[in-house]
Amino acid sequence: MNEHHSNNRKIDPLKSFLLDDNTPNDKNRVEIGPTLLARREWETAGLELPDLQAMRKFRWKRLTKHILDREYGGLLMFDPLNIRYATDSTNMQLWNTHNPFRAVLLCADGYMVIWDYKNSPFLSEFNPLVKEQRSGADLFYFDRGDKIGDAADVFANEVRLLISEHGNGNNRLAVDKIMLHGLRSLEALDFKLMDGEEVTEKSRSIKGIDEIKAMRCASYACEKAIYEMEQVTRSEVCNENLSENDIWSILHAENIKRGGEWIETRLLTSGPRTNPWFQECGPRIVQNNEIIAFDTDLVGAYGICVDISRTWWIGDQSPRPDMIYAMRHAHEHIMKNMEMLKPGVHMSDLTKNAHKLDEKYQVGKYSCLMHGCLLYTSPSPRDLRKS
């Protein structure tokens, strides 16, 4: 029962041991990744794949440097996206967001330990930067019941021993998101808890070469998924039997086909449901000569979030003049603001010099001028009042 198939894997001797992204050429491997469909599309597009071994090491170095710069003993992570960044390993990502059973401790000397599901320690063994696999970080009531305090004490003591050995006994510990009992148990051991999200966000603020390659690949895969969704939409709407949910399901399927993982939101609406924005995708049947608007918000290949917003006019007639003007005004807004984006530009300069929307669009405008994925920076509402 303890002998995992991963320990007995065989690789085709006629093929290279490694794929172009420097991961094992093993169809039965534990490590997830992009599909053959995605790889073929990237090759046709002339995209260069990331070196995942190098990307993982870059991220590990970034996190370790930020720990040392702040004179912390270590960084304790529970957020599954931070764990993905630190280890590139996954385990029931969405379930983990509301049942935090995984944790990673990165010590000041670079020693990294993961607490995972007890029966699946092998899920991160492909990454040599993860030195130990343990279990016991599931500090939520559904798992532990009234014994949760005892489990938290055991976990906190393990952290203490690791910091003693690999963090020089420094009790300044950065933590991102932790359950209440875990917090109390760490504080009872005299840990001074610091803001772990500040560490992880600033670590991610600078991308390495291979991360940029991964982002390009993921973005291209998302664009191909959008293309497939558009083709079906344009061919089927005239039959008046295609719902918003039907259209949205195509993006889900095409994302998964390329090795993507999930979609964060349900932002696809049609006709009168497009305004006000933020209504969620529903059963409404899309009619001929209507607008469809969506925001991908998907976690795609390599775990990269790709957030693309689009609107389509679907029909055999022309849109109304006011819709054409709104689209042209929106396009001008995007292009003018894009021109300002360059290295060294301060956030305050972006808001001060931003393209101004017409007065009639002020009430329904988006909540921020521009944003990234997972590194969310929004200018103040005062600065945005007329942008």
Regions found by a protein language model. Give the residues of each.
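Active-site neighborhoods and metal-handling regions in enzymes and metal-associated proteins
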Residues: 1-378, 382
